[in-house]
């Protein structure tokens, strides 16, 4: 039996801002992620920071084109290193806690991070937290 609204899958983006980045240039994507991280770090509650970060990770995993997902993840990794150290700490803590919220999404993201990180500049690699 279909649900109240039928069995059609909802294909609307979870995060419209992130979805709009598909096809953008790298500087635009990096600036987007930097701004998003700054806003997330500014959230005054750790649980709310996790709640802000998790949908962004979900939206990334919904991008079917693997090369585009890699490109946006790469931009995210670069943007992370442009944050102030205290902002990086807050984002890192939220990301760790997000594994308890949606382990499948976060593990898929971590797999991509593990693949991309070695290809990035040493300054990016050294600033990104290792598990």
For the regions a language model picked out, list residue spans one by one.
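General marker for long, soluble alpha-helical cores
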Residues: 4, 10-78, 82, 86-131
């Amino acid at each position: 039996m279909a649900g109240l609204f039928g069995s059609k899958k909802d294909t609307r983006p979870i995060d419209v801002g992130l979805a709009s980045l598909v096809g953008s240039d790298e500087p635009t994507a990096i600036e987007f992620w930097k701004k998003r991280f700054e806003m997330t770090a500014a959230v005054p509650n750790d649980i709310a920071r996790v709640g802000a970060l998790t949908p962004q990770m979900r939206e990334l995993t919904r991008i079917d084109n693997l090369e585009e997902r890699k490109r946006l993840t790469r931009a995210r990794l670069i943007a992370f290193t442009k944050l102030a150290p205290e902002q990086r700490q807050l984002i890192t803590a939220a990301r760790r806690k997000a594994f308890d919220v949606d382990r499948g999404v976060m593990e898929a993201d971590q797999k991509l991070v593990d693949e991309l990180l070695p290809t990035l500049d040493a300054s990016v690699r050294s600033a990104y937290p290792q598990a």
